[in-house]
Amino acid sequence: MNFAIFAFLSFISGSIPFGYWIALRFGKMDIRKFGSKNIGATNVGRSIGWKFGFPVLVLDVAKGIFPVYLSGIYIPEGGVPFQLACGVLAVLGHMFSPFLGFKGGKGVATTLGVFLVLTPIACFGAIFVFLVTIKYFKFVSIGSIFASLTLPLVYAFSSILLLHEEVSYWILGTMVFISIGIILTHRENIFRILNRSELFAVKNEDEERNGDSERNRR
């Protein structure tokens, strides 16, 4: 029963739409109707300021950290496979939140939280790829896709070459599974990139004016 309860709580905690609620409370807006229409930290930061976007980022990462960390403490007999299951459920909760009609965010920050507990070195490598990609391409979506693709590779190479540990196929397989999910949640971003209509990581002047006009019409 403890396994089922913890699994349920992992999904529910992951489904808490912090970005949506914070934008609604402090920005007086439905964030799903502005910018990229995503509930994540980037869209919140771009739409109402990073003093709100950064807390959303921290909270979304925490949604991945706590289910994995606490399941390892309170249900140690479940081992890494159960920790991963709780992590996957948290990510799925973020992507398919019952609070938002089973729609949600991309799952990138929550995925980061999951693997920060289990494989921090791999996460730091993926964060580095994310930052370099954004620096070069100027799109958060491309950074997220590249980071999710490289996370399993960084994990495998860091385990073998740096930590001299055996690669856990539970962890590697879960990384691949979630990475595929993250890429699928970025389908619209990919289409916008191909159409040259994707929003930049930092607003330019035209986007700023358009955003102000949208808010003024509300």
UniProtKB/Swiss-Prot annotation:
Spans through the membrane: 3-23, 53-73, 82-102, 112-132, 142-162, 166-186
A GO BP entry: phospholipid biosynthetic process
Subcellular localization, as worded in the UniProt entry: Cell inner membrane
Top-level taxon of the source organism: Bacteria
Main subcellular localisation: membrane
Keywords: Cell inner membrane, Cell membrane, Lipid biosynthesis, Lipid metabolism, Membrane, Phospholipid biosynthesis, Phospholipid metabolism, Transferase, Transmembrane, Transmembrane helix
InterPro entries: G3P_acylTferase_PlsY
Reactions that this protein is recorded to catalyse: an acyl phosphate + sn-glycerol 3-phosphate = a 1-acyl-sn-glycero-3-phosphate + phosphate
Pathway: Lipid metabolism; phospholipid metabolism
GO cellular component, one term: plasma membrane
Entries under Pfam families matching the protein: G3P_acyltransf
A single MF term (Gene Ontology): acyl-phosphate glycerol-3-phosphate acyltransferase activity
Topology in the lipid bilayer: Multi-pass membrane protein
The EC number(s) this enzyme carries: 2.3.1.275
Family in the record: Belongs to the PlsY family.
Subunit structure comment from the entry: Probably interacts with PlsX.
Function text: Catalyzes the transfer of an acyl group from acyl-phosphate (acyl-PO(4)) to glycerol-3-phosphate (G3P) to form lysophosphatidic acid (LPA). This enzyme utilizes acyl-phosphate as fatty acyl donor, but not acyl-CoA or acyl-ACP.
Name of this chain's protein: Glycerol-3-phosphate acyltransferase
